[in-house]
Amino acid sequence: METSLRRAAAPAGAVAERTVLRNGGTVRDAVAVEEPLEIRVDGDRLATTMRTPGADGDLALGFLFAEGIISGVEDVGTVIHCGRPGEEGYGNVMDVRSAAGMRIDPERILEGRRFVPVSAACGVCGRLSIDHLMERIRTLPAGEPVAPALVAAGMEILARSQPVFERTGGLHAAVLVGRDGAPIASAEDVGRHNAVDKVVGAALRAGRVGPRAAAGPAPALLAVSGRAGFEIVQKAAAAGVPVIASVSAPSSLAVDLARAAGVTLCGFVRGERMNVYANGERLGLTGP
């Protein structure tokens, strides 16, 4: 299967330099930038996450979509940074405005759930209960089979989509891949949940995800660095992505949710060798 292996470029503002001690002397070293991003809806603060600057609008869209606060880009009029260039803190507040004739209403969606600001390692914090999440998660149909070769191809694309990690060793990454093996979106971030939100948001904008997606084939694979936790599976299911591949292990909750949601969950992927924790029949396998 042919894949796009062109290396991605690092986004502006994602890398900083700091002086460090090394071998008895001092050198300037590249480190990944971590800054807060406040997400607002129609001017009202909803959440704050620690993220790496870059694709902030996609992060906000992906986050709101995964939470069920928006159903697609049709709900959104504008996504803008607040303030003016040059002002202190400019670029660290995103305001998502409702489309004309629409009203994005987080309070209605989040009613009955305790919602608090999130961090890069939030996981399932801020939710009233895991049971509530299980009840509202989207269940994917069996759909068409996916070749194990696509999983291997997705991990190759992931490895080539981490320019900031190559310079700093300090970020997570995520890529969405189509059934043809072509990348749809890629992103890096200090938080793996943020990286997934960024690629889902990019796919939303491109018309590849959402109830009215029509710009091309839907994503068939989400490849992520690090472990696959509960929230990664939730975000993939919300976006209708049938297969998740991770270089590391999933958590127990991730496995349980993947099985319930009809998502194929692969861990410890090394080429076409992998552990399949849920819904292996989509890959032509029998078992979990």
From Swiss-Prot:
It comes from the Bacteria. InterPro entries: Cytidine_deaminase-like (IPR016193), FdhD (IPR003786). The keyword Iron does not apply. One of its GO terms (molecular function) is sulfur carrier activity. Mo-bis(molybdopterin guanine dinucleotide) binds at F268, V269, R270, G271, E272, R273. PANTHER family: FORMATE DEHYDROGENASE, SULFUR CARRIER PROTEIN FDHD. This is Sulfur carrier protein FdhD. It comes from Anaeromyxobacter sp. (strain K). The lineage of its organism: Bacteria, Pseudomonadati, Myxococcota, Myxococcia, Myxococcales.
